[in-house]
Regions:
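Short hydrophobic alpha-helices and adjacent helix-cap/hinge residues
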Residues: 1-328
Length: 328
């Protein structure tokens, strides 16, 4: 599906929905809507719940949830957003794709997590003062992009050519590419930029074509930019790296769990737990537009030794000592 068609479908699907949120019934705990394009079990929802528990909330007593998982269906996502609009939720929590389905609900505060740039995505006016009814956390960190290249170089001292797999539909993709290029140049590495376009819903042949271009180029290693499309295809990407004997680094631990050699980035579960702090502030009267977009400051390096063995690669002890988690 074309990106513009996707966004217009979302807008059209919600323009006719009357908003009935905000009128919380007396004696009932405030209800938070959780809108996800994915499926259950949902570790990010569990992270958010954990964050609320740390703040003293008790589900069913001082807080309640209305949960909608779209299972990868645009129609289900639109229906879920419409249902939440009618369910007296005082707040909606959503990822980027789901936010695009819910953003027409101007009267309901919306908290989001996004792997890219929320300003470039058109969600907020600025990181410091988002404005409107949205705020949240971005995973995008250009410093982290450079560190991924450095970690690959430590694992592969003879690294000379590096493929960078990137989704051009991802907001902030160009900034992440520039940071990766800068790090590669500083280390004497030739970067091969391989782009594909993946809409939030529906299969796309472009990712397979991009992987075929990487196979033909025969780079020494691969860096995969973290976002929704590569996350959804993380198992295929990990298997590709193993089959091609191509050491690869990814953005989140879920990629390494799926068989990727390494990952470096913020913990998604911990970040969703931090999102509960913003939920608490909004429940206590803060306006989303006054809460600055947060960027993670803590990152974790995960190394999959099973994959290293399959690749015939020995990870240096110094890099293993640096790892926050080693999968054996």
């Amino acid at each position: 599906m074309d990106r513009r068609v996707f966004i217009s479908s979302i807008a059209g699907g919600l323009l006719t929905v009357p908003v009935a949120a905000g009128a919380q019934q007396a004696g009932r705990p405030p209800r938070i809507g959780w809108l996800s394009a994915g499926s259950q079990p949902d570790p990010f929802l569990e992270g958010f719940r954990e964050g609320l528990r740390r703040l003293g909330y008790v589900e069913g007593q001082t807080i309640a949830f209305e949960i909608r998982h779209a299972q990868g269906s645009l129609e289900a996502l639109l229906a879920g957003a419409a249902e939440l609009a009618q369910s007296n939720v005082v707040l909606i929590v959503a990822s980027l794709t789901a936010v695009r389905a819910a953003r027409a609900l101007k009267d309901i505060p919306i908290l989001f997590t996004i792997s890219g740039d929320p300003v470039e995505a058109g969600l907020v006016r600025s990181l410091s003062r988002p404005g409107g009814n949205l705020t949240g956390i971005t995973f995008l960190s250009l410093e982290v992009a450079g560190k991924r290249v450095e970690f690959l170089k430590q694992a592969l001292p003879r690294l000379r050519t590096l493929a960078a797999l990137s989704n051009t539909d991802h907001p902030g993709e160009k900034s992440e590419l520039r940071a990766t290029e800068t790090a590669a140049q500083a280390l004497g590495i030739n970067l091969i930029y391989v782009a594909f376009s993946q809409s939030p819903f529906g299969a796309s042949p472009e990712l397979g074509k991009a992987l075929e271009r990487i196979r033909r180029a025969q780079p020494d290693a691969m860096v995969v930019f973290p976002e929704g499309a590569t996350m959804a295809n993380r198992l295929d990407l990990a298997n590709f790296g193993i089959a091609q004997r191509l050491p690869s680094i990814f953005g989140w631990s879920e990629y390494a769990d799926a068989g990727g050699l390494m990952s470096y980035g913020a913990s998604q579960r911990d970040t969703h737990a931090r999102l509960a702090i913003y939920a608490d502030k909004i429940l206590k009267g803060a306006k989303p537009g006054d809460l600055p977009i947060e960027q993670p400051t803590k990152f974790e390096l995960v190394i999959n030794l099973k994959t290293a063995k399959a690749l015939g690669l020995t990870i240096p002890p110094s890099l293993l000592q640096r790892a926050d988690q080693v999968i054996e």
